[in-house]
Amino acid sequence: MNIEMAYLLGMILGNGEIQQNSTETKITIDIPHKNLYTDDMKDTSVYVKASLFDIQSILEPLIGQHLIQSETKHSTKITFSKPNNEYVMREILRLVGSGTHHSTMKMNEELFSITSDEKKALLRGIADVTGYIRASNIAFKKESKQHRVYIEIPGNWYMVIDIANMLKAVDIPVQTIDFGHPNFRDSNVDKYNEGKKYYWKKEHQVKIYANEFLPIGFNIKHKQEALEKYSEELIKKNPNMKTHKFYWEKPIRRKTKPNHPCENDEALPEEIRGKHFESWPDLAGLLGYGE
C-alpha cells in the first residue's frame, strides 16, 4: 500500500465500477459535477478538467498507463484497463470486497490498518468523487455559517459505516448522518400518506464540519477552494463553537416519531429491518459506528 494506491481505492469505493471479462479488468471512475457552477459562478467542469492533471500525476505512474477521459454535462469519467492477472488489479478487487459497483463494495478490514496518511488519501479519493462542500444555515436554527462537507453514498449502507469509521480512525468526527431510512427521510409519514411510498429511498449523507475536514481536503480544485473559504468563515463566525465532538461525547437528541409502514422493507439491512429509530446515532451504532 502507498498513498497513490489508497487514493485510487478511495475513488473506486466512492464512485467506481469494475467490469471483468476472461482476460481483462476495466475500471471506470465517475467524477460528478454536483452543481454546474461554483458559488462564484465558475463552470464546474472547467475546474474538474484542470484538477485531472493533478489526478493523472497521482494515478498514471501507479497503473503504468494513461487514463482515458470522457465528459458529459453532469460528470467526467476516467477509465483504465489491465490484464486480470496483474497484481494491482487483483489487489483492488480484494480490497473493495470483490464488489463490481460502488453500491456493492465494502472496505477490506486491512484498510483500517494502513498508515494515517494513507487513510487520509483514501478518504480524499472518496470525497473527490462523492463529496461536496455546502454553505449551510440549517445545522443550527439560530446560527448561520455552519458549513459542512457532505459525502453522498447511494444505497450502500455498509459503506456509510466504513467511511464514518475511517474518519474516526483519523480523529475526524461526523456531525450527522442522514440515512436513507423511512424514520429520517419521511419521519412524519407524510410522503407515504401522499402515495409516495418509497420517497425515503434516497442516498445516505455523511456530514462533517468544514474545518474538521481540512486534514483530508480535496484534489478537485473548486472543492478545495470552497473548503478553505468556508472553514475560515465557520471558525471566524463561531469562535467558541466546539466542532470536534463525536456523537458519543454529547447528548443524543431523540425525536418522537410515528412508526413508518416501511420499517420492514426488504431493502433495509437485516440488522435494522423491523426496528424504529428516533435518532441517527442509534442506527449508526447498531450498524457498527460508535465508541
Predicted regions and their residues:
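Internal intein/HINT superfamily modules and their associated LAGLIDADG
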Residues: 1-291
